[in-house]
Amino acid sequence: DKEVAQIMQKYDLEAVPVVNARGKLVGRITIDDIIDVITEQAEEERQLMSGIVTDVEEDDSVWTLSKARLPWLIIGMVGGLLAAQITDLFSADIKIIAGLALFIPLIMATGGNVGIQSSSIVVQSLAVKNAFADGIGKRLMKVLVVALVNGAVLSVLVFGSVLLIFQDQSLSYTVAIALFAVVLLASFMGTVTPLVLDNFGINPALASGPFITTANDLLGLAVYFSVAHLLYSL
């Protein structure tokens, strides 16, 4: 059913013929027949992107709703604990340069948002089976160019803002360089992760929710503090 729905969506068809093993026409599938499949598929992907691992309805029991939501909430909590560990590793740097702590939310939020944007586009492409239409190399190159442009714009803006507000050139360079690196890495992860999941037969919509957000939060923190440690030790 899902394969038929994808074909009808891709080619904008109103009906698809049905033939038997001998190639004889035995009927047809219309858009009215397939609309429920499309709706169900969209709902399933929306729930996965929200971190709900099983198909649930609002009139289900409290325990059923809780079981569907808890797994990714627990994973998010574990991610938060790991983020605390990463921060603790660089606590000495934070004590010396207190301003570093002020930009942790900015780095984490930007990485998460960029990753979700990239993964959502890939998941949408995979849904209609055209993610590889132009070849994986061309897609990754386009992602890289977009990330370079967005990273450059955001880095210039944040550099000017930090310099204007805090009058600290070293801090401005640190935040700007880290933000640029985070945008590049988050874009790459957001693009590659759904493709890898799809290749292993796992619904790629998983990569558009808490998974990619948590992963990019950790990645962003590690990059940010590594850049800060490197620049301030020079």
Please tell me what each predicted stretch does:
Residues 56, 72, 112, 182-183:
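Hydrophobic alpha-helical scaffolding
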Residues 78, 84, 89-93, 97, ...:
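Generic detector of multi-pass transmembrane helix bundles and their immediately adjacent loops
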